[in-house]
Amino acid sequence: MKLTFLGHSAFLLENQEVSLVIDPFLTGNPMAPHDIPVKPNYILVSHGHGDHLGDAIRLAKETSATIVSVFELANYCARQGVLTHPMHIGGSHNFGPMKVKLTQALHGNSTGSDRGPAEYLGNPCGFLIYLGNKTIYHAGDTGLFGDMQLIGDLNSIDVALLPIGDNFTMGPTDALEAVKMLKPQRVIPMHYNTWPLISQDPTAFKKAVEQATTTQVDILQPGEFLKI
Protein backbone atom coordinates (compact mmCIF):
# COMPACT_ATOMS: atom_id res chain seq x y z
CA MET A 1 0.00 0.00 0.00
CA LYS A 2 1.27 3.46 -0.94
CA LEU A 3 0.63 6.69 0.97
CA THR A 4 1.60 9.85 -0.94
CA PHE A 5 1.78 13.30 0.64
CA LEU A 6 0.14 15.93 -1.56
CA GLY A 7 1.03 18.90 0.64
CA HIS A 8 -0.73 20.58 3.57
CA SER A 9 -3.15 17.89 4.87
CA ALA A 10 -3.80 16.10 1.57
CA PHE A 11 -2.85 12.46 1.11
CA LEU A 12 -3.39 9.83 -1.57
CA LEU A 13 -3.76 6.25 -0.30
CA GLU A 14 -3.63 3.47 -2.88
CA ASN A 15 -3.54 -0.29 -3.09
CA GLN A 16 -4.66 -2.71 -5.81
CA GLU A 17 -8.32 -2.30 -4.85
CA VAL A 18 -8.82 1.26 -3.60
CA SER A 19 -7.66 4.77 -4.46
CA LEU A 20 -8.52 7.25 -1.74
CA VAL A 21 -7.69 10.94 -1.39
CA ILE A 22 -8.04 12.84 1.89
CA ASP A 23 -8.63 16.61 2.08
CA PRO A 24 -7.63 17.25 -1.56
CA PHE A 25 -6.50 20.88 -1.42
CA LEU A 26 -4.59 20.97 -4.72
CA THR A 27 -5.59 24.09 -6.67
CA GLY A 28 -4.09 27.13 -4.98
CA ASN A 29 -1.95 25.01 -2.67
CA PRO A 30 1.64 26.28 -2.95
CA MET A 31 2.90 22.94 -1.60
CA ALA A 32 0.92 20.62 -3.89
CA PRO A 33 2.79 18.56 -6.50
CA HIS A 34 0.98 18.85 -9.81
CA ASP A 35 2.58 15.89 -11.60
CA ILE A 36 0.82 13.16 -9.60
CA PRO A 37 -2.43 11.83 -11.09
CA VAL A 38 -5.27 11.86 -8.56
CA LYS A 39 -8.09 9.58 -9.73
CA PRO A 40 -9.77 8.35 -6.55
CA ASN A 41 -12.66 6.00 -5.87
CA TYR A 42 -13.31 7.78 -2.58
CA ILE A 43 -12.68 11.30 -1.28
CA LEU A 44 -12.58 11.86 2.49
CA VAL A 45 -13.17 15.45 3.61
CA SER A 46 -12.58 16.33 7.26
CA HIS A 47 -14.30 19.74 7.12
CA GLY A 48 -15.45 22.44 4.75
CA HIS A 49 -12.65 25.01 4.95
CA GLY A 50 -11.17 25.74 1.55
CA ASP A 51 -7.78 24.23 2.35
CA HIS A 52 -9.47 20.86 3.03
CA LEU A 53 -12.62 20.66 0.90
CA GLY A 54 -10.36 22.01 -1.81
CA ASP A 55 -10.79 20.17 -5.11
CA ALA A 56 -13.16 17.52 -3.74
CA ILE A 57 -16.17 18.58 -5.83
CA ARG A 58 -14.13 18.84 -9.04
CA LEU A 59 -12.48 15.45 -8.50
CA ALA A 60 -15.79 13.80 -7.66
CA LYS A 61 -17.34 15.12 -10.87
CA GLU A 62 -14.35 14.04 -12.98
CA THR A 63 -14.00 10.54 -11.53
CA SER A 64 -17.46 9.70 -10.11
CA ALA A 65 -15.75 9.20 -6.75
CA THR A 66 -17.85 9.19 -3.59
CA ILE A 67 -17.25 11.97 -1.06
CA VAL A 68 -17.31 10.68 2.53
CA SER A 69 -17.81 13.21 5.30
CA VAL A 70 -20.06 14.30 8.15
CA PHE A 71 -23.77 14.47 7.33
CA GLU A 72 -24.05 18.24 6.84
CA LEU A 73 -20.94 18.56 4.68
CA ALA A 74 -21.89 15.49 2.64
CA ASN A 75 -25.30 17.06 1.97
CA TYR A 76 -23.61 20.32 0.90
CA CYS A 77 -21.50 18.34 -1.57
CA ALA A 78 -24.53 16.39 -2.81
CA ARG A 79 -26.18 19.71 -3.72
CA GLN A 80 -23.25 20.30 -6.06
CA GLY A 81 -24.25 17.17 -7.98
CA VAL A 82 -21.75 14.58 -6.75
CA LEU A 83 -21.99 11.17 -5.08
CA THR A 84 -21.72 11.29 -1.30
CA HIS A 85 -21.86 9.02 1.72
CA PRO A 86 -22.90 10.91 4.88
CA MET A 87 -21.66 9.76 8.28
CA HIS A 88 -21.28 11.08 11.80
CA ILE A 89 -18.57 10.96 14.46
CA GLY A 90 -18.29 7.53 16.06
CA GLY A 91 -19.90 5.82 13.08
CA SER A 92 -18.12 3.44 10.74
CA HIS A 93 -18.95 1.98 7.34
CA ASN A 94 -17.47 -0.64 5.03
CA PHE A 95 -16.62 0.54 1.53
CA GLY A 96 -15.73 -2.73 -0.16
CA PRO A 97 -12.39 -3.85 1.30
CA MET A 98 -12.00 -0.63 3.31
CA LYS A 99 -13.64 0.48 6.54
CA VAL A 100 -13.79 4.14 7.57
CA LYS A 101 -14.65 5.43 11.04
CA LEU A 102 -15.16 9.11 11.85
CA THR A 103 -13.45 10.53 14.92
CA GLN A 104 -13.74 13.72 16.91
CA ALA A 105 -11.78 16.82 15.88
CA LEU A 106 -11.64 20.18 17.64
CA HIS A 107 -11.96 22.82 14.93
CA GLY A 108 -14.60 24.63 12.86
CA ASN A 109 -16.58 23.52 9.81
CA SER A 110 -18.04 26.03 7.39
CA THR A 111 -17.69 27.11 3.80
CA GLY A 112 -18.78 29.97 1.60
CA SER A 113 -21.97 29.19 -0.31
CA ASP A 114 -24.92 30.64 -2.21
CA ARG A 115 -26.73 30.88 1.15
CA GLY A 116 -24.40 33.58 2.43
CA PRO A 117 -20.75 34.26 3.16
CA ALA A 118 -20.45 31.09 5.27
CA GLU A 119 -22.56 27.99 5.76
CA TYR A 120 -22.23 25.93 8.93
CA LEU A 121 -21.61 22.31 8.01
CA GLY A 122 -21.80 20.37 11.26
CA ASN A 123 -18.82 19.15 13.23
CA PRO A 124 -15.35 18.65 11.79
CA CYS A 125 -13.91 15.16 11.99
CA GLY A 126 -10.89 12.94 11.66
CA PHE A 127 -10.73 9.50 10.06
CA LEU A 128 -9.65 6.01 11.00
CA ILE A 129 -9.04 4.07 7.80
CA TYR A 130 -8.78 0.29 7.92
CA LEU A 131 -7.39 -1.11 4.69
CA GLY A 132 -5.17 -4.07 3.82
CA ASN A 133 -4.67 -5.09 7.46
CA LYS A 134 -3.35 -1.60 8.23
CA THR A 135 -4.84 1.24 10.26
CA ILE A 136 -4.24 4.87 9.30
CA TYR A 137 -5.43 7.77 11.44
CA HIS A 138 -5.88 11.17 9.79
CA ALA A 139 -6.64 13.59 12.61
CA GLY A 140 -8.02 16.38 10.41
CA ASP A 141 -7.55 19.90 11.72
CA THR A 142 -7.67 19.55 15.47
CA GLY A 143 -6.39 20.62 18.82
CA LEU A 144 -5.26 18.08 21.36
CA PHE A 145 -8.07 16.19 23.10
CA GLY A 146 -8.09 13.54 25.81
CA ASP A 147 -10.01 10.93 23.83
CA MET A 148 -6.96 10.46 21.63
CA GLN A 149 -6.03 8.10 24.45
CA LEU A 150 -9.11 5.99 23.64
CA ILE A 151 -8.35 6.08 19.92
CA GLY A 152 -4.90 4.73 20.72
CA ASP A 153 -6.17 2.14 23.20
CA LEU A 154 -8.83 0.78 20.85
CA ASN A 155 -6.70 0.71 17.70
CA SER A 156 -3.29 -0.50 16.67
CA ILE A 157 -2.37 2.50 14.53
CA ASP A 158 0.24 1.89 11.86
CA VAL A 159 0.46 5.51 10.65
CA ALA A 160 -0.91 8.68 12.26
CA LEU A 161 -1.18 11.86 10.20
CA LEU A 162 -1.06 14.74 12.67
CA PRO A 163 -1.15 18.54 12.24
CA ILE A 164 1.75 20.42 13.84
CA GLY A 165 1.35 23.93 12.41
CA ASP A 166 -0.10 25.60 15.54
CA ASN A 167 -2.40 28.67 15.40
CA PHE A 168 -5.28 26.84 13.64
CA THR A 169 -4.45 23.37 15.01
CA MET A 170 -2.26 21.86 17.67
CA GLY A 171 1.40 22.73 17.49
CA PRO A 172 4.43 20.47 17.92
CA THR A 173 4.28 20.34 21.73
CA ASP A 174 0.65 19.22 21.80
CA ALA A 175 1.23 16.92 18.83
CA LEU A 176 3.91 15.15 20.87
CA GLU A 177 1.33 14.56 23.61
CA ALA A 178 -1.02 13.22 20.93
CA VAL A 179 1.63 10.73 19.84
CA LYS A 180 2.03 9.55 23.43
CA MET A 181 -1.71 8.85 23.64
CA LEU A 182 -2.17 7.37 20.16
CA LYS A 183 0.94 5.16 20.27
CA PRO A 184 1.25 4.76 16.49
CA GLN A 185 4.13 2.93 14.87
CA ARG A 186 4.80 5.91 12.61
CA VAL A 187 3.76 9.56 12.39
CA ILE A 188 3.73 11.88 9.40
CA PRO A 189 3.42 15.58 10.34
CA MET A 190 1.05 17.69 8.24
CA HIS A 191 -0.64 21.11 8.10
CA TYR A 192 2.58 23.12 8.48
CA ASN A 193 4.79 25.41 6.36
CA THR A 194 2.09 25.98 3.73
CA TRP A 195 2.04 29.64 4.78
CA PRO A 196 4.21 31.67 7.20
CA LEU A 197 1.48 31.62 9.86
CA ILE A 198 1.92 27.87 10.32
CA SER A 199 5.69 27.66 9.93
CA GLN A 200 7.29 24.86 11.96
CA ASP A 201 10.49 22.82 12.06
CA PRO A 202 9.49 19.19 11.40
CA THR A 203 13.02 18.01 12.20
CA ALA A 204 12.69 19.35 15.75
CA PHE A 205 9.32 17.59 16.04
CA LYS A 206 10.86 14.34 14.82
CA LYS A 207 13.67 14.60 17.38
CA ALA A 208 11.26 15.31 20.25
CA VAL A 209 8.94 12.43 19.35
CA GLU A 210 11.67 9.88 18.83
CA GLN A 211 13.38 10.85 22.09
CA ALA A 212 10.16 10.59 24.11
CA THR A 213 8.44 7.61 22.44
CA THR A 214 9.09 4.52 20.31
CA THR A 215 7.21 6.07 17.37
CA GLN A 216 9.10 6.77 14.15
CA VAL A 217 8.50 10.13 12.46
CA ASP A 218 8.57 10.26 8.66
CA ILE A 219 8.94 13.77 7.23
CA LEU A 220 7.56 13.67 3.70
CA GLN A 221 8.02 16.40 1.15
CA PRO A 222 5.04 16.96 -1.16
CA GLY A 223 5.08 14.22 -3.78
CA GLU A 224 7.00 11.77 -1.61
CA PHE A 225 5.38 8.55 -0.48
CA LEU A 226 5.59 5.91 2.20
CA LYS A 227 5.15 2.20 1.57
CA ILE A 228 3.00 0.78 4.36
From Swiss-Prot:
Gene3D superfamilies named in the record: Ribonuclease Z/Hydroxyacylglutathione hydrolase-like
InterPro entries cross-referenced by the UniProt entry: Metallo-B-lactamas (IPR001279), RibonucZ/Hydroxyglut_hydro (IPR036866), UPF0173 (IPR022877), UPF0173_UPF0282_UlaG_hydrolase (IPR050114)
GO molecular function annotations of the record: hydrolase activity
SMART domains recorded: Lactamase_B (SM00849)
Alphabetical keyword list: Hydrolase
Spans through the membrane: none
Pfam families: Lactamase_B_3
HAMAP family: UPF0173
UniProt-listed PANTHER family: UPF0173 METAL-DEPENDENT HYDROLASE MJ1163 (PTHR43546:SF3), UPF0173 METAL-DEPENDENT HYDROLASE MJ1163-RELATED (PTHR43546)
Family that this chain belongs to: Belongs to the UPF0173 family.
Descriptive protein name: UPF0173 metal-dependent hydrolase Dred_1740
Organism: Desulforamulus reducens (strain ATCC BAA-1160 / DSM 100696 / MI-1)
